[in-house]
From Swiss-Prot:
This protein's encoding gene: rsmG
HAMAP family per UniProt: 16SrRNA_methyltr_G (MF_00074)
Main localisation: cytoplasm
Entry's family note: Belongs to the methyltransferase superfamily. RNA methyltransferase RsmG family.
Keyword DNA damage: no
Binding site for S-adenosyl-L-methionine: 78, 83, 101-103, 129-130, 142
Enzyme class of the recorded protein, top EC level: transferase
Protein name as it appears in the record: Ribosomal RNA small subunit methyltransferase G
Cellular component annotations (GO), alphabetically ordered: cytosol
Length: 208
């Protein structure tokens, strides 16, 4: 399994150490083992290669943007099984990642993974987003919901000049969603991702 992870990371030109491969391997195995108990991901994608490509690699496609902006802290909203927050934290150990997850089941899983993978740069926040008072430079979200469902509440959690990085799919759908929220932000940028996954993947950057 580690060879599959190494191939996938190399195919996308990601830099990694062997310990990163070990952590990803253990992480995926834990998801497979505990998925039914914690309701982490769709059963249709609950095999090793699907998790690796559709979740791990997809999450890593945003890492270069995080490093380019270089915030001191990142808030990952609705972390679920830990995508993208856990993955970004594994490969970006010098930065603090806050993973916000309201589900007790999923946050329990995240706390287990944090300890097992020894992720000292991760903190799990188990509550509704409306209860968060801290302001952040950088917020990530990887959700199937339309951006107009969360744009305003996330904007209010941004520091001045901060941004939201939303993982999104097809460009046509993005255009429709952007038109609904364009007046909320000073600038909106869409970045096409260089994915080998044969699916349309884009990042939408929403600047306060």
């Amino acid at each position: 399994m580690i060879s599959d992870i190494e191939f996938a990371l190399s195919e996308h030109n990601f830099q990694f150490a062997y310990k990163d491969l070990q952590k990803i391997n253990l992480y995926i195995k834990r998801i497979l083992l505990l998925n039914t108990r914690f309701n982490l991901i769709s059963n249709s994608n609950s095999n090793f290669n699907s998790i690796l490509n559709l979740h791990v690699i997809d999450s890593l496609l945003g890492l270069s943007t995080v490093k380019e902006i270089n915030p001191s802290e990142v808030l990952d909203v609705g972390s679920g099984a830990g995508f993208p927050g856990i993955i970004l934290a594994i490969f970006d150990t010098s930065r603090k990642y806050y993973l916000l997850e309201r589900s007790k089941k999923k946050s329990t899983f995240l706390k287990m993974i944090k300890l097992e993978l020894d992720l000292e740069n991760v903190k799990i926040l188990e509550y509704e987003i409306e209860k968060e008072k801290k302001k952040y430079e950088f917020i990530t979200i990887r959700a199937f919901r339309s951006m107009n469902e969360y744009a305003l509440i996330l904007k209010n959690l941004l520091k001045g000049g901060g941004l939201i990085m939303a993982y999104k799919g097809k460009f046509d759908r993005i255009n429709l969603e952007v038109n609904q929220i364009k007046n909320l932000f000073s600038k909106i940028e869409v970045k096409s991702l260089n994915s080998k996954l044969r699916v349309d993947r884009n990042l939408v950057l929403l600047y306060r």
